[in-house]
Amino acid sequence: MFTRSLTRLQPQLFSRRLITSSRIPKYSSFLNQSPVNIIKRNYVIIHKQRKKEPVLRYLFYMIVLSWGFIYYVANRVDKKTVKKDFSEREFQQYEEATGVKRRNKLISGDLSSKYKFYVIPYINDNEQLDKIVNLLKSKDEGTHVKIIDPSELIEQQKQDEGLRYHYLLHDLEEQKRPYPQGLITALVKQEINNYSNTRQGTFETNFIIKNYPQTTAEAIKFENDVADVQKCLILHFDMLNELPKYKNEEEQRAIQNVDGYFDSVGRAKTLIDKFDPMDEEFEEIMMEDL
């Protein structure tokens, strides 16, 4: 570039005409510049202005995502609500949805030799219950006796909102509907499981479950899901005199069928001691059978 400029100026340099500074191209500013300045001038970085996305679009996306999340959570909650059709099948589905149901028997292995279960389908006199407790203690010295009353378990569930069957029991009570098959067994099973995880649960224990089972279905479910029954104790006086006072014919027949179910497998024992003068003889016979 500098050579070209000299070539154009050569005729003028050898001519006699006076060359004025105004006729000479002004290249001094270019020649005096440093390479860095030349590069800066020829390679200017042009910053492109970014397009600003509309704020309303982001707000719209956030609202849509929030609604979708709320809808998802609401559906998950609806799936865990209490079933309105409380048949046995529906109750089994309720157990599976809430994570209660277990396919294996609760008491098995080492616990089956440490725990024994005695059921009393119907009892109205607590004095009789105390007598049975004392007989078991004298029969198995050093063995703990644990009494389970399903009616107390139901009240505990009703009073504590944090318990699993709280809302189910209140709905059944409001609708005046009977308890579905398997509900009482589920409560008893839960109580036994809680006991087995305590310090007392590490010792040998005789369980007495009063006023249970009162249907054959509950008896079968207990032996399938919880443990085998050692003896089903039938209080002759209460079954004959007290049962008709507090239960209708259908309920009486269901409880009597429980007696027949355990009697068919040789695990039912009828106790006839109330107002019986031969108490000592009764105790000897009972201890042999237990």
UniProtKB/Swiss-Prot annotation:
Transit peptide: 1-26
Gene3D superfamilies: P-loop containing nucleotide triphosphate hydrolases (3.40.50.300)
Bilayer topology: Single-pass membrane protein
Superkingdom per UniProt: Eukaryota
Range of residues in the leader sequence: none
Annotated localization: Mitochondrion membrane
GO CC terms in record: mitochondrial membrane
Location (main, coarse): mitochondrion
InterPro entries found in the cross-reference section: P-loop_NTPase
Transmembrane segments annotated in the record for this chain: 55-74
Keywords associated with the record: Membrane, Mitochondrion, Transit peptide, Transmembrane, Transmembrane helix
Family of this protein: Belongs to the AIM36 family.
Name by which UniProt lists this protein: Altered inheritance of mitochondria protein 36, mitochondrial
Protein's gene: AIM36
